[in-house]
């Protein structure tokens, strides 16, 4: 390992070739393990010519390929196994080798003088196959292309990645074990440590990753080779530890070995897929057998891998041969990368080991640099695509071949061992591993970056940096890999799920890119395949641990098998993706991101090397399938990556100071990839971010990881946004990947950062910052990520902007592609990140099979985004897939529950009506029906409370390990919620939400104020009290009934008592637990229970209405003479009219039908309590009706939210961030600019009360009835006129506030419009009666009714408009336009409510209408309409209170909505976010920008919690900036739903923590992650 440290130092300093060799060696070790598992496949593929990875390969094709891996390309077969000196071979093979060498030389010069030595050493060192470093150097033999060639290298990386992939896969199969094994063997203790760490990390991915980070830090990284004079170990703390960490690095290798086994199968495909450039790589087919065995042992994953691998071949057409031609990016750059990658490989390996030692912090940093650097560097001019194709064709993976099979086998054995361990650990901590998988994934993403799928390819294979972190350490430290195994498995999971999805996504993205860059497309598809292969192979064999874990995970239902589906979708989209993201393919250079592998901290480097090896193996397999997926082969990725890594290291270590270029280098140093410099960084960021995100993604909606990552690159993202088109065309895919990688580089390192964070700290804070941020933001448990590196990360971002300007721009495009292309293979991860970043990483990787549902949703999103990827505006498409995916069973249950509720309501109408209409029906015959309603509702409520209590203990579990719990708990516990949430907001599946939602009833994202506003629920309580009094009086009335009469029935006492209990329990349910009653587990029970309660409330309403109408009529009915006793009221009003004759036949219509044995008047209220009930009922029964209306409406909204995949569920950030941030029951009042309206309203209220008192005094005396009616009518007319004028003035004033057109029709709006119907009914009947009344002195009655109609219509419009208005500027906050009117209307509606309740509710108060319609008709009209009219006045008050309180606050939520509505393009949004950041203390805007469009305003409210995740993740990812910086974009894209909601929410997050400046991105990252963590 000494040579390894030397190599890492030299390579890190400036030797791309050495680093490449080193990484290649590591990758070989990993790949060898993988190939041990997958070598059979590799042999098969070697035998077969793997078709070049075809982005267009369908999942089915992929499966076919997996089943029957195509023979390795003739080139692969023809290529002799590369010898350790393959570096020499590589330079000759590539046409550009001189350039590569020159570039290498430059890079070496930049990085360090020792680099050349390492390059030389690489060729020389490689000769000893046993030496891991030599093996790595061999792998690195392909000299990493110089920075400028790196673009070519990037392209060539595709070729190299593919060709090397194939060879590397083979070599890795044979050689990687030595290098990895050497690491492992060299540091068995470390290996054990790694295993322990992996286990621990698997158990506590968040902790583990952080701990791993610490452990890695504590465990000195493997001694770095002496850095060149100009390079210093930026990873100081970790580098310092580098020498000791070697143990760790090896311990990582054990973990990686487990992870690699799955990769090997992919390698097989990939090996076959990429041209067999170096059969030497193929020789380790023996590992392939193991790998195959492992794959077989993990049939699900291997087939998927094969699918992934073979489909890419189909995509790329001829697997190996076609790939070389197909990789457009590969042709020219690849040759250069081959030479340069040698140094990089060597340096990378050394550095990788150092990084491995530093695994987490270094890894985190390195991948970002690589991703970015690769992207920048790799993005070659379109003309280079042909070169890439050529390069790809001739790039052999030298070191991999040369790596001894012994090492491969040993590594594989170790991997298998660890795989077993990790498998258990992984299965246990798969989610954590998957979270870690983000690292691994980030590594594959760097590979993807190298590939055409810059992020994906690099992320997938070369991305190995993060992956090496997970992968190389995976090989060298399989245990650590377990730590990373989460990463690796996450990487595998992500590779496999993410890679598969990503790879398929990548494939799609690759295919898209391929459209422009055939090679890149190939690479990407290879990456895709490789990712898939990695996902598949690693899962099964490559990373036995990861594979086993994945297998377990798939067995758990989250395995790769599930992931393949998304890849399938991805696969077909790839062609589109190609065309759409063909330019991103150009970005293929990011594949050069192989440096990310190198850039991985020493541990990361090892991990990266192992990861690269695994990735290479997987990529080779995939590469064989997807020739373009250069990253697949560690050597190929490494060659490309190494250059990037070299540059990164040089820059990072040397330039670490420079914020832009140096910062990126710093990040590179940190990330080892940053060496690639700012150029690759963009890509690298994408790839790394992508990978890292998946790893941390998995955890809590690793959007946060994405978020961090994005956040880190956020500054760049803006530039990305500006240049999104170029990236779209040339680097859209890779930019997204880059952005992802950037994020990944930042975030993935963090993801690895959980595991890789340790390594990352070793690297300059620059890289750590991104990673740290990433860990913090994405992996809520990773909050510990070095913030010191935040500046560096910012530097990265800044540096990235230049190169990543396009790249990030591409990343931006890729953000869509992230969403759309999914950032190449990694895209699946980011898409997963967007869809359910936390669950998707797990899903894509470990949970590919089982969690496919969640993952698949995200991947579908990813697939969808593939097409939309081109346009950032297509984020919505990203949002749409998350849209509720309703299962057939759920739809059926919803339908039946709705029919059941309708049946209850119809019966509630029929029973009381039949009793009143017919005299042959005994009284209270239907009371049993109401007992059934009340008791059934109470049982359901008690069940809900019980589940709420039972569920509470579970909340901490998901919270404890958000990644595991988020994905697994989400998959199981929150499966329903994830089903809903994932469906509604797949990506939204916020880890925080899963954390808090595990309970059966978890908080329904507090939409507005829960379900309905606080005032509405207060009104429900007040009306409930009145209703309980009413029921209590009815209950007492029973004891006065004569036992001998037919009216005496025990049910008459039992029903009111039961109703009283029901009202009380339901009141508690509605008022207090409304926010907590969110059903996730027992959806069918919840649907029928809620619908039963809705039916109960409506039946109560109808029953009370009919009973009260009956009793009021009977009050005036005289059974003796069968007349109505209301004549005493009429005479005063009649003025000579013969009002109602006492002629017995005059009103026989009243008792008509009462010829049966049962007369309704027999049981009327006659006794003391009966009289009291009758007198109080006009005031009490409206309370029952209004209470039932409110409860029915609230319950209906809850039922609908269950039926539809809880789109409202997106917990608001405030709910997520902190359990409740502020108690939901804490309210504050600001009376500014409300005094005039308040006191004028009080004056009107006083006049109204006086008028009512006069009315009741006069109406009691027959001679003054007319005067009483006239007095009240005049008072009403005055109030209506004043209120109408005030409403019109208010509508003019409130127009100054910002209108939110996205706000959906809310519960308050529904109740308001519904209640207004009652007012209209009453007034229309009154106008008709007044018009046909001949008396002129009564004309005030119809005029008053018309005035009431006009006033209610204006008021309804005013309320509906004002409820969508929001103050958005300081002027609004200062002037508060319209607030005086709102205050006045609030008080006036209270006055009108009093009039309606006290005066209008009594039929005898309106002699004209009573005389015109008759007693029966008018009483019925009054009892039906007046409760609604009363409720309209009350609810208008409620709505005005809500407007008064909310419209004049500058809420980030609404501002985000405003931003969304105002900002069309992401770039504009980005700028808007910048402005907001500058002007406001929150960065919610960043999430908004990232999301692009809120799904709905409703979701915004509800989405605020999402926003917490989003802001935590989206804002955390700098979501708004640069579309969330790739991952952020994807996440933001997903967050777009959620993030936009969250965007609003982001504000809701109170992202104030986020700094206002682009640099605040770091702060932002830190901030959002912190929130997420808190929410977690």
Curated annotation (Swiss-Prot):
Start and end residues of each stretch annotated as Disordered: 1-602, 621-736, 771-845, 962-1001, 1498-1549
Please give, as recorded in its UniProt entry, the membrane topology of this protein.
Answer: Multi-pass membrane protein
Where does the record place Low complexity bias? Answer: 58-67, 76-85, 243-252, 465-507, 661-685, 826-839, 1503-1512
Specify the glycosylation sites in chain numbering.
230, 267, 1121, 1479
Entries under InterPro entries matching the protein: Otopetrin
Task: Output a single Gene Ontology CC term carried by this record.
Answer: membrane
Compositional bias of type Basic residues: which residue ranges?
Answer: 686-709
> Biased composition, Gly residues: where in the chain?
1513-1528
Q: Where is the composition biased (Pro residues)?
A: 219-228, 253-264, 563-575
**Pfam families linked to this entry:** Otopetrin
Return the Acidic residues bias intervals.
Answer: 103-116, 159-171, 186-198, 206-216, 316-341, 402-419
What this chain does, per the entry, is described as: Proton-selective channel that specifically transports protons into cells. Proton-selective channel activity is probably required in cell types that use changes in intracellular pH for cell signaling or to regulate biochemical or developmental processes.
State what protein this is by name: Proton channel OtopLc
């Amino acid at each position: 390992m000494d040579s390894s440290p030397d190599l890492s130092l030299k390579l890190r300093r400036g030797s791309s070739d050495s680093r490449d060799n080193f990484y290649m060696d590591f990758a070989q070790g990993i790949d060898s393990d993988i190939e041990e598992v997958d070598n059979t496949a590799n042999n098969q593929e070697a035998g077969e010519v793997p078709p070049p990875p075809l982005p267009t390969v369908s999942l089915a094709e992929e499966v076919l390929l997996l089943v029957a891996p195509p023979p390795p390309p003739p080139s692969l077969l023809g290529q002799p196994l590369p010898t350790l000196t393959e570096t020499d071979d590589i330079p000759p093979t590539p046409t550009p080798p001189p350039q590569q060498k020159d570039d290498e030389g430059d890079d070496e010069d930049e990085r360090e003088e020792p680099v050349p030595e390492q390059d030389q050493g690489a060729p020389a060192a490689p000769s000893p196959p046993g030496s891991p470093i030599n093996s790595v150097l061999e792998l690195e033999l392909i000299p990493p292309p110089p920075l400028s060639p790196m673009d070519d290298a990037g392209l060539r990386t595709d070729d190299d990645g593919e060709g090397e992939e194939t060879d590397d896969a083979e070599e890795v199969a044979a050689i990687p074990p030595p290098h990895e094994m050497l690491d492992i063997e060299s540091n068995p203790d470390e290996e054990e440590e790694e295993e322990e760490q992996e286990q621990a990390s698997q158990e506590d991915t968040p902790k583990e990753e952080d701990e791993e980070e610490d452990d890695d830090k504590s465990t000195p990284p493997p001694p770095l080779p002496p850095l060149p004079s100009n390079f210093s170990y930026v990873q100081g703390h970790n580098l310092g530890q580098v020498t000791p960490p070697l143990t760790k690095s090896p311990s990582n290798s054990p973990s990686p070995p487990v992870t690699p086994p799955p990769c090997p199968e992919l390698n097989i495909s990939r090996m076959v897929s990429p041209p067999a450039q170096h059969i030497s790589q193929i020789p380790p087919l023996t590992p392939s057998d193991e790998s195959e065995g492992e794959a077989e042992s993990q049939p699900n994953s291997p087939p998927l891998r094969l699918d992934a691998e073979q489909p890419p071949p189909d995509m790329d057409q001829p697997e190996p041969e076609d790939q070389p031609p197909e990789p457009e990016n590969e042709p020219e750059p690849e040759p250069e990368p081959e030479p340069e990658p040698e140094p990089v490989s060597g340096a990378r390996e050394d550095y990788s080991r150092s990084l491995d030692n530093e695994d987490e912090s270094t890894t985190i940093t390195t991948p970002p640099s690589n991703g970015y650097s690769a992207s920048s560097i790799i993005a070659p001019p379109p003309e280079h695509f042909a070169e890439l194709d050529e390069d790809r064709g001739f790039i052999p993976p030298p070191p991999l071949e040369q790596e001894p099979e012994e090492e491969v086998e040993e590594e594989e054995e170790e991997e298998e061992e660890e795989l077993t361990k990790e498998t258990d650990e992984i299965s246990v901590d798969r989610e954590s591993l998957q979270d870690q998988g983000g690292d691994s994934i980030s590594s594959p993403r760097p590979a993807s970056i190298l590939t055409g799928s810059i992020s994906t390819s690099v992320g997938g294979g070369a991305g190995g940096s993060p992956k090496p972190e997970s992968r190389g350490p995976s090989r060298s430290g399989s245990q650590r890999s377990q730590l990373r195994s989460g990463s690796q498995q996450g990487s595998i999971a992500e590779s496999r799920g993410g890679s598969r999805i990503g790879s398929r996504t990548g494939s799609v993205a690759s295919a898209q890119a391929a459209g422009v860059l055939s090679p890149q497309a190939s690479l990407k598809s290879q990456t895709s395949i490789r990712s898939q292969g990695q996902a598949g192979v690693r899962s099964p064999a490559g990373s036995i641990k990861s594979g086993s874990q994945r297998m377990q995970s798939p067995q758990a239902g989250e395995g790769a098998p599930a992931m393949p589906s998304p890849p399938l979708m991805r696969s077909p989209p790839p062609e589109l993706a190609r065309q759409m993201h063909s330019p991103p393919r150009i970005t293929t250079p990011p594949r050069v991101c192989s440096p990310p592998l190198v850039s991985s901290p020493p541990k990361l480097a090892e991990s990266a090397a192992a990861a690269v090896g695994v990735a290479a193996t997987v990529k080779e397999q995939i590469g064989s399938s997807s020739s373009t997926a250069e990253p697949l082969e560690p050597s190929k990725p490494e060659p490309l990556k190494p250059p990037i890594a070299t540059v990164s290291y040089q820059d990072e270590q040397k330039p670490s100071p420079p914020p832009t270029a140096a910062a990126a280098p710093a990040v590179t140093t940190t990330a080892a990839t940053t060496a690639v410099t700012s150029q690759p960084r963009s890509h690298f960021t994408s790839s790394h971010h992508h990978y890292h995100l998946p790893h941390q993604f998995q955890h809590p909606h690793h959007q946060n990881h994405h978020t961090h990552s994005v956040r880190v690159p956020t500054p760049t993202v803006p530039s990305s946004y500006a240049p999104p088109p170029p990236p779209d065309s040339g680097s859209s895919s890779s930019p997204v990947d880059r952005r992802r990688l950037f994020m990944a580089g930042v975030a993935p390192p963090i993801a690895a950062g959980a595991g890789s964070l340790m390594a990352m700290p070793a690297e300059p804070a620059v890289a750590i910052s991104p990673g740290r941020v990433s860990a913090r933001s994405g992996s809520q448990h990773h909050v510990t990520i070095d913030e010191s590196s935040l500046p560096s990360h910012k530097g990265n971002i800044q540096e990235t902007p230049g190169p990543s300007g396009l790249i990030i721009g591409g990343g931006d495009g890729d953000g869509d592609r992230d969403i759309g292309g999914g950032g190449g293979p990694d895209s699946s991860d980011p898409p997963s990140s967007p869809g359910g970043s936390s669950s998707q990483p797990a899903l894509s990787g470990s949970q590919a099979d089982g969690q496919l549902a969640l993952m698949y949703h995200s991947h579908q999103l990813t697939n969808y985004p593939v097409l939309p990827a081109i346009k950032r505006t297509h984020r919505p498409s990203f949002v749409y897939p998350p849209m509720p995916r309703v299962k057939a069973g759920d739809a059926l249950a919803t339908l039946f529950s709705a029919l059941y509720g309708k049946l209850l309501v119809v019966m509630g109408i029929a029973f009381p009506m039949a009793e009143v209409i017919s005299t042959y029906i005994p009284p209270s015959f239907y009371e049993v029906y109401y007992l059934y309603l009340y008791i059934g509702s109470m049982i359901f409520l008690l069940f809900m409370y019980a589940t709420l209590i039972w569920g509470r203990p579970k909340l901490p579990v998901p919270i404890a390990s958000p990644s595991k719990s988020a994905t697994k708990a989400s998959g199981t516990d929150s499966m329903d919620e994830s089903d809903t949430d994932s469906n509604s907001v797949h990506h939204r599946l916020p880890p925080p939400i899963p954390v808090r939602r595990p309970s059966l009833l978890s908080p329904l994202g507090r939409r507005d104020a829960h379900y309905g506003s606080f005032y509405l629920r207060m009104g429900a309580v007040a009306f409930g009290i009145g209703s309980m009094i009413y029921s209590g009086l009815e209950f007492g009335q029973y004891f006065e009934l004569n036992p001998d009469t037919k009216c005496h029935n025990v049910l008459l006492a039992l029903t009111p008592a039961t109703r009283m209990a029901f009202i009380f329990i339901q009141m508690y349910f509605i008022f207090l637990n409304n926010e907590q009653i969110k059903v996730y587990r027992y959806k069918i029970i919840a649907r029928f229970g809620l619908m039963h309660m809705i039916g109960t409330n409506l039946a109560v309403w109808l029953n009370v209405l009919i009973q009260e109408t009956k009793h009021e009529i009977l009050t005036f009915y005289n059974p003796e003479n069968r007349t109505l006793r209301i004549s005493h009221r009429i005479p005063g009003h009649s003025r000579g009219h013969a009002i109602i004759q006492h002629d017995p036949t005059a009103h026989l219509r009243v008792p008509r039908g009462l010829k049966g044995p049962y007369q309704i008047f027999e049981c009327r209220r006659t006794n003391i309590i009966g009289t009291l009930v009758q007198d109080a009922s006009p005031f009490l029964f409206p309370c029952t009706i209004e209470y039932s209306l409110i409860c029915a409406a609230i319950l209906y909204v809850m039922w609908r939210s269950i039926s539809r995949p809880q789109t409202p569920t997106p917990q608001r950030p405030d709910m997520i961030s902190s359990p409740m941030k502020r108690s939901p029951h804490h309210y504050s009042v600001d009376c500014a600019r409300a005094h005039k309206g308040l006191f004028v309203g009080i004056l009107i209220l006083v006049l109204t009360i006086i008028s009512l008192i006069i009315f009741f005094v006069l109406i009691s005396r027959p001679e003054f009835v007319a005067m009483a009616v006239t007095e009240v009518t005049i008072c009403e007319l005055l109030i209506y006129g004043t209120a109408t004028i005030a409403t019109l003035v208010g509508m003019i004033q409130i127009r100054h506030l910002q209108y939110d057109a996205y706000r959906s029709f809310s519960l308050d709006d529904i109740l308001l419009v519904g209640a207004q119907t009652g007012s209209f009914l009453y007034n229309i009947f009154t106008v008709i009666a007044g018009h046909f009344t001949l008396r002129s002195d009564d004309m005030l009655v119809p005029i008053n009714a018309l005035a009431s109609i006009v006033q209610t219509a204006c008021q309804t419009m005013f309320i509906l408009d004002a409820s969508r208005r929001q103050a958005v500027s300081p002027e609004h906050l200062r002037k508060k336009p319209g607030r005086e009117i709102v205050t006045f209307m609030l008080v006036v509606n209270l006055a009108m409510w009093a009039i309606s309740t006290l005066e209008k509710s009594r039929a005898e108060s309106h002699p004209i209408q009573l005389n015109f319609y008759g007693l029966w008709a008018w009483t019925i009209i009054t009892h039906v309409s007046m409760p609604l009219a009363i409720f309209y006045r009350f609810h208008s008050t409620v709505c005005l209170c809500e407007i008064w309180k909310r419209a004049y606050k500058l809420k980030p939520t609404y501002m985000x909505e405003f931003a969304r509505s105002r900002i069309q393009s992401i770039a504009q949004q980005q700028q808007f976010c910048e402005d907001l950041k500058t002007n406001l203390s929150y960065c919610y805007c960043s999430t908004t920008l990232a999301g692009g469009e809120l799904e709905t305003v409703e979701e915004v409210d509800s989405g605020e919690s999402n926003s917490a995740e989003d802001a935590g993740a989206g804002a955390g990812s700098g979501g708004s900036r640069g579309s969330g910086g790739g991952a952020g974009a994807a996440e933001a894209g997903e967050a777009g739903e959620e993030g936009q909601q969250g965007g609003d929410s982001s504000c809701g997050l109170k992202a104030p923590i986020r700094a206002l400046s682009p640099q605040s991105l770091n702060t932002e990252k830190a901030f959002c992650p912190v929130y997420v963590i808190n929410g977690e």
